Amino acid sequence: MMERTFSIIDFGACSTTDELQTRYIQAAIDECFLQGGGEVQIPEGTFLTGGIRLRSNVCLHLMENAHLKGIRDPEAYGVLEDDVIEPIPNNDRTVKLYHTPTADENFQTYEWFNRAGSRWNHGLIRAAYAKNVSVIGECGSALDGSDCYDALGEEFYRGPHLMNFFYCENITLRGYTCVDSANWAHAFFYSKNLIIEKVKIYAGHDGVHATRCDNITIRQCAFYTGDDCVAGFDNQNVIVQDCLMNTACSAMRLGATNALIEKCRFWGPGEYVFRGSLSLEEKRGGGKPQKIPSHRYNMLSVFTYYADFSTAIREQPGNIIIRHCNIENVDRLLHYNYSGNEIWQKNRPLQSVMFEDVYAMGISMPLTAYGDEKVPLYLTMRNVDIQFAPEDENMDFIHTCYYSMINLENVRIQGLSNGALVRSWGGQGRLIYKNLICDIPKENYFLTSDKSFVCQTI
Protein backbone atom coordinates (compact mmCIF):
# COMPACT_ATOMS: atom_id res chain seq x y z
CA MET A 1 0.00 0.00 0.00
CA MET A 2 1.44 3.37 -1.03
CA GLU A 3 1.88 6.01 1.66
CA ARG A 4 -0.51 8.92 1.36
CA THR A 5 1.16 12.21 0.36
CA PHE A 6 -0.27 15.69 0.66
CA SER A 7 1.26 18.85 -0.79
CA ILE A 8 0.59 22.11 1.01
CA ILE A 9 0.20 23.70 -2.45
CA ASP A 10 -3.01 21.70 -2.94
CA PHE A 11 -4.39 23.33 0.21
CA GLY A 12 -3.68 26.88 -0.94
CA ALA A 13 -0.12 27.52 0.23
CA CYS A 14 2.01 29.90 -1.82
CA SER A 15 5.65 30.92 -1.45
CA THR A 16 5.48 34.05 -3.60
CA THR A 17 3.47 36.16 -1.19
CA ASP A 18 3.93 37.88 2.16
CA GLU A 19 0.61 36.43 3.31
CA LEU A 20 0.78 34.12 6.32
CA GLN A 21 0.60 30.48 5.19
CA THR A 22 -0.16 28.90 8.57
CA ARG A 23 -3.74 27.82 7.85
CA TYR A 24 -2.83 26.14 4.55
CA ILE A 25 0.05 24.19 6.05
CA GLN A 26 -2.08 23.17 9.02
CA ALA A 27 -4.94 22.10 6.74
CA ALA A 28 -2.62 19.69 4.92
CA ILE A 29 -1.35 18.23 8.21
CA ASP A 30 -4.88 17.86 9.57
CA GLU A 31 -6.15 16.10 6.46
CA CYS A 32 -3.17 13.74 6.47
CA PHE A 33 -3.83 12.92 10.13
CA LEU A 34 -7.58 12.42 9.65
CA GLN A 35 -6.91 9.99 6.79
CA GLY A 36 -4.68 7.86 9.00
CA GLY A 37 -1.31 9.48 8.46
CA GLY A 38 1.25 9.87 5.69
CA GLU A 39 3.55 12.56 4.35
CA VAL A 40 2.96 16.30 4.08
CA GLN A 41 5.28 17.87 1.53
CA ILE A 42 6.66 21.41 1.70
CA PRO A 43 7.98 22.25 -1.79
CA GLU A 44 10.82 24.57 -2.75
CA GLY A 45 10.25 28.16 -1.67
CA THR A 46 9.89 30.26 1.46
CA PHE A 47 6.61 29.97 3.33
CA LEU A 48 5.85 32.52 6.06
CA THR A 49 4.10 30.89 8.98
CA GLY A 50 3.11 31.02 12.61
CA GLY A 51 2.80 27.95 14.82
CA ILE A 52 1.69 24.65 13.26
CA ARG A 53 0.80 21.41 15.00
CA LEU A 54 2.28 18.09 13.92
CA ARG A 55 0.13 15.04 14.63
CA SER A 56 0.53 11.28 15.05
CA ASN A 57 1.72 9.26 12.07
CA VAL A 58 2.51 12.39 10.05
CA CYS A 59 5.86 13.09 8.40
CA LEU A 60 6.52 16.73 7.54
CA HIS A 61 8.81 16.52 4.52
CA LEU A 62 10.71 19.63 3.51
CA MET A 63 11.72 19.15 -0.09
CA GLU A 64 14.91 20.56 -1.59
CA ASN A 65 15.29 24.28 -0.78
CA ALA A 66 12.03 24.40 1.17
CA HIS A 67 12.00 27.02 3.93
CA LEU A 68 9.50 27.53 6.72
CA LYS A 69 10.05 31.06 8.01
CA GLY A 70 8.51 32.10 11.30
CA ILE A 71 6.73 35.42 11.48
CA ARG A 72 8.14 37.99 13.93
CA ASP A 73 4.82 38.23 15.79
CA PRO A 74 4.84 36.25 19.06
CA GLU A 75 1.03 36.15 19.11
CA ALA A 76 0.99 33.88 16.02
CA TYR A 77 2.16 30.69 17.75
CA GLY A 78 -0.71 29.57 20.01
CA VAL A 79 -1.75 26.66 17.81
CA LEU A 80 -1.82 24.07 20.59
CA GLU A 81 -4.09 26.08 22.85
CA ASP A 82 -6.51 26.86 19.98
CA ASP A 83 -6.67 23.38 18.45
CA VAL A 84 -10.15 21.82 18.10
CA ILE A 85 -9.21 18.51 16.43
CA GLU A 86 -7.16 17.28 19.40
CA PRO A 87 -7.80 19.67 22.29
CA ILE A 88 -5.20 19.43 25.02
CA PRO A 89 -6.45 18.73 28.57
CA ASN A 90 -7.39 21.69 30.72
CA ASN A 91 -4.75 20.73 33.27
CA ASP A 92 -2.12 21.17 30.56
CA ARG A 93 -3.09 24.79 29.99
CA THR A 94 -1.89 27.83 31.88
CA VAL A 95 -1.78 31.59 31.54
CA LYS A 96 1.28 31.76 33.78
CA LEU A 97 4.17 33.59 32.16
CA TYR A 98 7.90 33.20 32.51
CA HIS A 99 9.49 34.65 35.61
CA THR A 100 13.12 34.65 36.65
CA PRO A 101 13.73 31.45 38.68
CA THR A 102 15.10 31.72 42.21
CA ALA A 103 17.07 29.27 44.32
CA ASP A 104 14.16 28.31 46.60
CA GLU A 105 11.63 27.44 43.88
CA ASN A 106 10.15 23.99 43.35
CA PHE A 107 8.28 22.07 40.69
CA GLN A 108 4.94 23.79 41.37
CA THR A 109 6.30 27.25 40.55
CA TYR A 110 7.43 26.17 37.07
CA GLU A 111 3.92 25.91 35.63
CA TRP A 112 4.91 28.18 32.75
CA PHE A 113 7.62 25.65 31.87
CA ASN A 114 5.95 22.28 32.51
CA ARG A 115 2.61 22.71 30.78
CA ALA A 116 2.31 22.22 27.05
CA GLY A 117 -0.32 24.92 26.73
CA SER A 118 1.76 27.84 27.98
CA ARG A 119 3.01 30.86 26.11
CA TRP A 120 6.61 29.92 26.93
CA ASN A 121 6.11 26.60 25.08
CA HIS A 122 5.02 28.23 21.83
CA GLY A 123 6.87 26.94 18.80
CA LEU A 124 7.02 27.03 15.03
CA ILE A 125 6.34 23.28 14.96
CA ARG A 126 4.56 21.75 17.94
CA ALA A 127 3.39 18.27 18.87
CA ALA A 128 1.64 16.94 21.96
CA TYR A 129 0.48 13.44 22.87
CA ALA A 130 1.65 12.29 19.43
CA LYS A 131 3.29 9.09 18.22
CA ASN A 132 5.36 8.31 15.15
CA VAL A 133 6.06 11.86 14.02
CA SER A 134 8.92 13.06 11.87
CA VAL A 135 10.38 16.12 10.21
CA ILE A 136 12.65 15.24 7.29
CA GLY A 137 14.58 17.80 5.28
CA GLU A 138 16.23 17.53 1.90
CA CYS A 139 19.28 19.51 0.73
CA GLY A 140 18.87 23.24 1.33
CA SER A 141 15.78 22.91 3.53
CA ALA A 142 15.52 25.17 6.57
CA LEU A 143 13.46 26.25 9.55
CA ASP A 144 13.92 29.94 10.33
CA GLY A 145 12.84 31.36 13.69
CA SER A 146 13.52 34.96 12.63
CA ASP A 147 14.77 35.81 16.16
CA CYS A 148 11.15 36.56 17.04
CA TYR A 149 11.14 39.00 19.98
CA ASP A 150 8.65 38.50 22.82
CA ALA A 151 8.65 40.93 25.75
CA LEU A 152 6.60 38.35 27.71
CA GLY A 153 8.96 35.48 26.92
CA GLU A 154 11.97 34.00 28.67
CA GLU A 155 14.29 36.67 30.03
CA PHE A 156 11.73 39.10 28.60
CA TYR A 157 12.94 38.86 25.02
CA ARG A 158 12.98 35.23 23.85
CA GLY A 159 10.19 34.14 21.54
CA PRO A 160 8.88 30.74 20.40
CA HIS A 161 10.99 27.62 20.03
CA LEU A 162 11.51 26.19 16.56
CA MET A 163 10.15 22.81 17.69
CA ASN A 164 8.34 21.86 20.88
CA PHE A 165 7.25 18.31 21.79
CA PHE A 166 5.25 17.22 24.86
CA TYR A 167 4.37 13.63 25.78
CA CYS A 168 5.43 12.23 22.40
CA GLU A 169 6.85 8.86 21.33
CA ASN A 170 8.94 7.83 18.36
CA ILE A 171 10.20 11.14 16.99
CA THR A 172 12.57 11.28 14.01
CA LEU A 173 14.16 14.55 12.91
CA ARG A 174 16.62 14.55 10.02
CA GLY A 175 18.36 16.56 7.37
CA TYR A 176 17.21 20.18 7.72
CA THR A 177 18.94 23.35 8.93
CA CYS A 178 17.76 25.54 11.82
CA VAL A 179 18.56 29.26 11.86
CA ASP A 180 17.83 32.08 14.30
CA SER A 181 15.60 30.18 16.69
CA ALA A 182 13.95 32.69 19.03
CA ASN A 183 14.38 30.22 21.90
CA TRP A 184 15.47 26.57 21.81
CA ALA A 185 15.73 24.97 18.38
CA HIS A 186 14.36 21.66 19.73
CA ALA A 187 12.48 21.44 23.04
CA PHE A 188 11.38 18.00 24.27
CA PHE A 189 9.35 17.26 27.40
CA TYR A 190 8.21 13.92 28.85
CA SER A 191 8.90 12.11 25.58
CA LYS A 192 10.76 8.97 24.52
CA ASN A 193 12.50 7.39 21.57
CA LEU A 194 13.98 10.48 19.94
CA ILE A 195 16.33 10.43 16.95
CA ILE A 196 17.92 13.66 15.73
CA GLU A 197 20.43 13.19 12.93
CA LYS A 198 22.19 15.22 10.25
CA VAL A 199 20.62 18.44 11.51
CA LYS A 200 22.51 21.76 11.41
CA ILE A 201 21.76 24.54 13.88
CA TYR A 202 23.01 28.09 13.46
CA ALA A 203 22.71 30.93 16.00
CA GLY A 204 19.70 31.23 18.30
CA HIS A 205 19.72 29.56 21.71
CA ASP A 206 19.93 25.90 22.86
CA GLY A 207 20.25 23.42 20.01
CA VAL A 208 18.55 20.42 21.66
CA HIS A 209 17.01 20.68 25.13
CA ALA A 210 15.27 17.65 26.63
CA THR A 211 13.47 17.43 29.97
CA ARG A 212 12.48 14.06 31.43
CA CYS A 213 12.98 12.15 28.20
CA ASP A 214 14.17 8.59 27.57
CA ASN A 215 16.17 7.02 24.75
CA ILE A 216 17.64 10.02 22.96
CA THR A 217 20.04 9.65 20.04
CA ILE A 218 21.73 12.69 18.50
CA ARG A 219 24.19 11.90 15.73
CA GLN A 220 26.03 13.59 12.88
CA CYS A 221 24.63 16.99 13.82
CA ALA A 222 26.40 20.36 13.65
CA PHE A 223 25.78 22.90 16.40
CA TYR A 224 26.83 26.52 15.98
CA THR A 225 24.69 27.96 18.75
CA GLY A 226 24.54 31.09 20.86
CA ASP A 227 23.47 29.06 23.90
CA ASP A 228 24.05 25.44 24.97
CA CYS A 229 24.39 22.86 22.19
CA VAL A 230 22.76 19.94 24.05
CA ALA A 231 20.98 20.55 27.34
CA GLY A 232 18.36 19.25 29.76
CA PHE A 233 18.05 16.91 32.72
CA ASP A 234 16.15 13.95 34.14
CA ASN A 235 16.94 12.16 30.90
CA GLN A 236 17.76 8.46 30.63
CA ASN A 237 19.83 6.70 27.98
CA VAL A 238 21.29 9.55 25.96
CA ILE A 239 23.69 9.06 23.04
CA VAL A 240 25.47 11.94 21.28
CA GLN A 241 27.76 10.79 18.47
CA ASP A 242 29.83 12.31 15.67
CA CYS A 243 28.68 15.87 16.30
CA LEU A 244 30.31 19.26 15.87
CA MET A 245 29.77 21.61 18.81
CA ASN A 246 30.58 25.30 18.76
CA THR A 247 28.85 27.66 21.17
CA ALA A 248 29.07 30.79 23.28
CA CYS A 249 27.83 28.78 26.29
CA SER A 250 28.26 25.11 27.27
CA ALA A 251 28.49 22.33 24.71
CA MET A 252 26.74 19.95 27.11
CA ARG A 253 24.60 21.30 29.97
CA LEU A 254 23.23 17.94 30.93
CA GLY A 255 21.80 15.89 33.71
CA ALA A 256 21.21 12.25 32.78
CA THR A 257 21.31 8.65 33.86
CA ASN A 258 23.44 6.75 31.33
CA ALA A 259 24.80 9.18 28.75
CA LEU A 260 27.46 8.55 26.12
CA ILE A 261 29.03 11.47 24.28
CA GLU A 262 31.57 10.20 21.77
CA LYS A 263 33.48 11.07 18.62
CA CYS A 264 32.57 14.74 18.88
CA ARG A 265 34.56 17.89 18.25
CA PHE A 266 34.14 20.83 20.63
CA TRP A 267 35.70 24.22 19.96
CA GLY A 268 35.41 27.87 20.82
CA PRO A 269 34.96 30.73 20.70
CA GLY A 270 31.40 30.65 19.41
CA GLU A 271 30.68 31.64 15.83
CA TYR A 272 27.45 33.23 17.05
CA VAL A 273 26.85 35.56 19.97
CA PHE A 274 25.23 34.66 23.27
CA ARG A 275 22.08 36.69 22.73
CA GLY A 276 21.70 37.42 26.42
CA SER A 277 24.67 39.79 26.06
CA LEU A 278 22.90 41.94 23.46
CA SER A 279 21.28 45.28 24.17
CA LEU A 280 17.49 45.50 24.36
CA GLU A 281 17.47 47.33 21.04
CA GLU A 282 19.49 44.54 19.40
CA LYS A 283 17.16 41.88 20.83
CA ARG A 284 14.12 43.68 19.51
CA GLY A 285 15.63 44.17 16.09
CA GLY A 286 16.79 40.59 15.49
CA GLY A 287 19.42 39.87 12.88
CA LYS A 288 23.16 39.48 13.23
CA PRO A 289 24.80 42.00 15.58
CA GLN A 290 28.28 43.34 15.05
CA LYS A 291 31.09 41.89 17.16
CA ILE A 292 31.80 44.41 19.91
CA PRO A 293 33.41 43.95 23.37
CA SER A 294 30.08 43.84 25.22
CA HIS A 295 28.96 40.81 23.19
CA ARG A 296 30.05 37.44 24.57
CA TYR A 297 31.37 34.64 22.34
CA ASN A 298 33.66 32.57 24.60
CA MET A 299 32.77 28.90 25.04
CA LEU A 300 32.13 28.31 28.75
CA SER A 301 32.53 24.55 29.13
CA VAL A 302 32.51 21.15 27.50
CA PHE A 303 30.35 19.57 30.22
CA THR A 304 28.25 21.46 32.76
CA TYR A 305 26.00 19.51 35.10
CA TYR A 306 22.33 20.49 35.09
CA ALA A 307 19.64 19.75 37.67
CA ASP A 308 17.21 22.48 38.72
CA PHE A 309 13.77 22.18 40.30
CA SER A 310 11.60 22.58 37.20
CA THR A 311 10.85 18.85 37.43
CA ALA A 312 11.49 15.98 39.83
CA ILE A 313 14.38 13.66 38.90
CA ARG A 314 13.37 10.01 38.67
CA GLU A 315 16.71 8.18 38.85
CA GLN A 316 20.16 8.87 40.26
CA PRO A 317 22.08 10.92 37.64
CA GLY A 318 25.39 9.43 36.65
CA ASN A 319 27.28 7.09 34.33
CA ILE A 320 28.04 9.97 31.99
CA ILE A 321 30.88 9.12 29.61
CA ILE A 322 32.68 11.53 27.29
CA ARG A 323 35.12 9.69 25.06
CA HIS A 324 37.01 9.84 21.76
CA CYS A 325 36.58 13.62 21.60
CA ASN A 326 38.72 16.58 20.54
CA ILE A 327 38.43 19.91 22.32
CA GLU A 328 39.90 23.34 21.51
CA ASN A 329 39.75 26.75 23.20
CA VAL A 330 37.08 26.12 25.82
CA ASP A 331 37.18 27.80 29.24
CA ARG A 332 36.36 24.67 31.26
CA LEU A 333 36.46 20.94 30.65
CA LEU A 334 34.14 20.08 33.57
CA HIS A 335 31.80 22.28 35.61
CA TYR A 336 30.01 20.39 38.38
CA ASN A 337 29.31 22.78 41.23
CA TYR A 338 27.03 21.36 43.93
CA SER A 339 28.26 23.85 46.53
CA GLY A 340 24.88 25.56 46.68
CA ASN A 341 25.47 28.83 44.88
CA GLU A 342 24.27 27.63 41.48
CA ILE A 343 20.50 27.41 41.03
CA TRP A 344 20.84 25.18 37.96
CA GLN A 345 22.68 22.52 40.02
CA LYS A 346 20.62 22.15 43.21
CA ASN A 347 18.31 19.19 42.49
CA ARG A 348 19.70 15.64 42.73
CA PRO A 349 23.52 15.45 42.59
CA LEU A 350 25.73 13.75 40.01
CA GLN A 351 27.25 10.39 40.95
CA SER A 352 29.81 9.73 38.23
CA VAL A 353 31.39 11.16 35.10
CA MET A 354 34.26 9.87 32.96
CA PHE A 355 36.51 11.41 30.31
CA GLU A 356 38.23 8.77 28.18
CA ASP A 357 40.48 9.10 25.12
CA VAL A 358 40.09 12.87 25.08
CA TYR A 359 42.47 15.46 23.65
CA ALA A 360 41.96 19.03 24.84
CA MET A 361 43.92 22.21 24.24
CA GLY A 362 43.41 25.85 25.18
CA ILE A 363 41.62 25.15 28.49
CA SER A 364 41.82 28.24 30.71
CA MET A 365 40.13 27.31 34.00
CA PRO A 366 40.30 24.43 36.53
CA LEU A 367 37.96 21.47 36.42
CA THR A 368 35.25 21.90 39.06
CA ALA A 369 34.16 18.64 40.73
CA TYR A 370 32.19 19.69 43.81
CA GLY A 371 29.91 16.81 44.79
CA ASP A 372 27.35 16.04 47.48
CA GLU A 373 28.12 14.73 50.97
CA LYS A 374 25.61 11.88 50.62
CA VAL A 375 26.29 11.18 46.94
CA PRO A 376 30.00 11.93 46.45
CA LEU A 377 31.33 12.19 42.92
CA TYR A 378 33.34 9.49 41.17
CA LEU A 379 35.50 11.22 38.54
CA THR A 380 37.54 9.18 36.06
CA MET A 381 40.00 10.54 33.50
CA ARG A 382 41.59 7.86 31.34
CA ASN A 383 43.87 8.43 28.35
CA VAL A 384 43.43 12.20 28.51
CA ASP A 385 45.86 14.74 27.07
CA ILE A 386 45.01 18.26 28.22
CA GLN A 387 46.86 21.48 27.45
CA PHE A 388 46.08 24.58 29.47
CA ALA A 389 46.30 28.23 28.53
CA PRO A 390 45.80 29.51 32.09
CA GLU A 391 45.05 33.09 33.02
CA ASP A 392 47.03 32.53 36.24
CA GLU A 393 50.33 30.62 36.33
CA ASN A 394 49.38 29.31 39.79
CA MET A 395 46.15 27.75 38.56
CA ASP A 396 45.10 24.33 39.86
CA PHE A 397 44.03 21.33 37.80
CA ILE A 398 40.97 20.20 39.79
CA HIS A 399 38.90 21.91 42.48
CA THR A 400 36.88 19.39 44.44
CA CYS A 401 34.80 18.58 47.50
CA TYR A 402 32.77 15.49 48.43
CA TYR A 403 34.17 12.93 46.04
CA SER A 404 34.43 9.18 46.45
CA MET A 405 37.21 8.75 43.89
CA ILE A 406 39.33 10.80 41.52
CA ASN A 407 41.01 8.34 39.19
CA LEU A 408 43.64 9.72 36.80
CA GLU A 409 45.01 7.04 34.46
CA ASN A 410 47.33 7.80 31.56
CA VAL A 411 46.77 11.54 31.91
CA ARG A 412 49.14 14.17 30.52
CA ILE A 413 48.76 17.76 31.73
CA GLN A 414 50.61 20.60 30.02
CA GLY A 415 50.75 24.28 30.94
CA LEU A 416 50.33 23.93 34.71
CA SER A 417 53.24 23.86 37.14
CA ASN A 418 52.78 26.02 40.23
CA GLY A 419 49.30 25.13 41.47
CA ALA A 420 47.78 21.96 42.88
CA LEU A 421 46.89 18.83 40.96
CA VAL A 422 43.85 18.48 43.22
CA ARG A 423 42.76 21.14 45.68
CA SER A 424 40.10 19.95 48.11
CA TRP A 425 37.58 21.81 50.22
CA GLY A 426 36.77 18.73 52.31
CA GLY A 427 34.90 15.45 52.07
CA GLN A 428 37.97 13.62 50.82
CA GLY A 429 37.74 10.31 49.07
CA ARG A 430 40.57 8.55 47.25
CA LEU A 431 42.95 10.06 44.73
CA ILE A 432 44.50 7.48 42.40
CA TYR A 433 46.92 8.30 39.61
CA LYS A 434 48.76 5.99 37.24
CA ASN A 435 51.07 7.04 34.42
CA LEU A 436 50.49 10.71 35.20
CA ILE A 437 52.66 13.15 33.25
CA CYS A 438 52.75 16.78 34.41
CA ASP A 439 55.04 19.55 35.67
CA ILE A 440 53.19 19.91 38.96
CA PRO A 441 55.51 18.94 41.85
CA LYS A 442 54.43 15.84 43.75
CA GLU A 443 54.08 17.76 46.98
CA ASN A 444 51.30 19.70 45.25
CA TYR A 445 49.39 16.66 44.02
CA PHE A 446 46.90 17.00 46.86
CA LEU A 447 46.35 20.21 48.80
CA THR A 448 43.52 21.27 51.07
CA SER A 449 42.11 24.76 51.15
CA ASP A 450 41.31 26.75 54.27
CA LYS A 451 39.52 29.44 52.27
CA SER A 452 35.87 29.62 51.29
CA PHE A 453 35.00 27.84 48.08
CA VAL A 454 34.45 30.36 45.28
CA CYS A 455 33.19 29.34 41.86
CA GLN A 456 31.81 31.46 39.05
CA THR A 457 28.33 30.26 38.11
CA ILE A 458 27.43 29.56 34.50
Q: What kind of feature is each model-predicted range?
A:
Residues M1-I458:
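Extracellular/periplasmic carbohydrate-active domains that bind, remodel
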